[in-house]
């Protein structure tokens, strides 16, 4: 890792808080506005496609979704940091899998208005596969620090699995996590690589401005706060699902 400037002020806890807030903003648009109003209106014929662009809620939705694009890049970066610094990869992976299971029904309720929808899976599965991919890259790393072909094949398999089951951000999410892991020794290269790979989402590369100012410290985070960060995803999805259901 390149030397960090003393002017860099964002701790890991600060970045995680920003990621959670922007994710909430994004999901208000995706769940309450899109799944709760726009999509039902189009399906019922009460809202035409031609009028959609002039619809005030459509414009609000665009603002919310563009703001929310910052969340996933931050979570990917923080996942890499967590993997690099954890002393228990199995425990780290286990928590992600556990919350993937706990979050699936809230995810389906929030975005598909049904408790069981197998067409898409929540982001915890993408993060879990990202950890698996990084574990493979680390296991088969060469003495010069470059990834071995076995590790690349393993990571590719994890990305293929994400694509097959359609996790949130699917294969590209896993591949971006791997790229951030492989470029972790140079913050400038890591930020540039991440920003370039997220160009498919207009505002997502801006997340790496925040990453650039990461100070390399975990920051104040009590055991309760750590648990709260894990629980935030399924709980906020349940709340949004409830709000959306009241709107229908």
Where are these regions (language model features)?
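Alpha-helical transmembrane segments and their immediate juxtamembrane cytosolic regions
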Residues: 1-248
